[in-house]
């Protein structure tokens, strides 16, 4: 594991940069089962749709459960829902749009709020069938069930455009623990992070802190003994 320079180590941003270095040696669920992991996609459109569906399912749900639900959708959506000439299997806009909400719900029944997400997924597919996949934030957040956090990740992973910092519970928790921000909600955290974090760090900060929050800086009983900044973190148990 490398180390940050002396100048970089100063202040909360320096603590984050050291976490970034430690993350290079950590494989977390977000690295192997996050929204950017899109196996078996045959086209760019299908890859982008996979990312959007994964993000929709991910709220209040662990990456492992979301990943399993995605696999079930790819495997279990009925072939009768495919259009003429469409390859068999896979997760496509047409297959979802042509599927019953009940069948979609059965595929994703282990994710949080699956009833609502099944209905939203069906509606999204119907919208995308008419309008195509979105490329702008305003179009993304107009879709049912898609908020700022998901839209920012979609823009980054599906469109290769980083327009902001996506903040979830891990990013919010760790940013406050290390003193990078002093905020009470994720939207305030997003605004403050975009103010204090250099733009060159925006693309990766979500993955870095989510993975760190899944493995080391967990919500309850954080593993401070394994943390590279345990002697300097203001929230350290050491």
From Swiss-Prot:
Claim: Disulfide bond is one of the keywords in the record: no
EC number: 3.2.2.-, 4.2.99.18
Cofactor requirement: [4Fe-4S] cluster
Subcellular location: Nucleus; Mitochondrion
Catalytic activity from the UniProt record: 2'-deoxyribonucleotide-(2'-deoxyribose 5'-phosphate)-2'-deoxyribonucleotide-DNA = a 3'-end 2'-deoxyribonucleotide-(2,3-dehydro-2,3-deoxyribose 5'-phosphate)-DNA + a 5'-end 5'-phospho-2'-deoxyribonucleoside-DNA + H(+)
GO cellular component: mitochondrion; nucleus
Chain positions recorded as [4Fe-4S] cluster binding sites: 217, 224, 227, 233
InterPro entries, per database record: DNA_glycosylase (IPR011257), Endonuclease3_FeS-loop_motif (IPR003651), Endouclease-III_FeS-bd_BS (IPR004035), HhH-GPD_domain (IPR003265), HhH_base_excis_C (IPR023170), NTH1 (IPR030841)
Cofactor details (free text): Binds 1 [4Fe-4S] cluster. The cluster does not appear to play a role in catalysis, but is probably involved in the proper positioning of the enzyme along the DNA strand.
Active site location: 149
Domain HhH: 129-155
UniProt keyword annotations, A-Z: 4Fe-4S, DNA damage, DNA repair, Glycosidase, Hydrolase, Iron, Iron-sulfur, Lyase, Metal-binding, Mitochondrion, Nucleus, Transit peptide
Name of this chain's protein: Endonuclease III homolog
Organism, scientific name: Encephalitozoon cuniculi (strain GB-M1)
Source lineage: Eukaryota, Fungi, Fungi incertae sedis, Microsporidia, Unikaryonidae
Gene behind this protein: NTH1
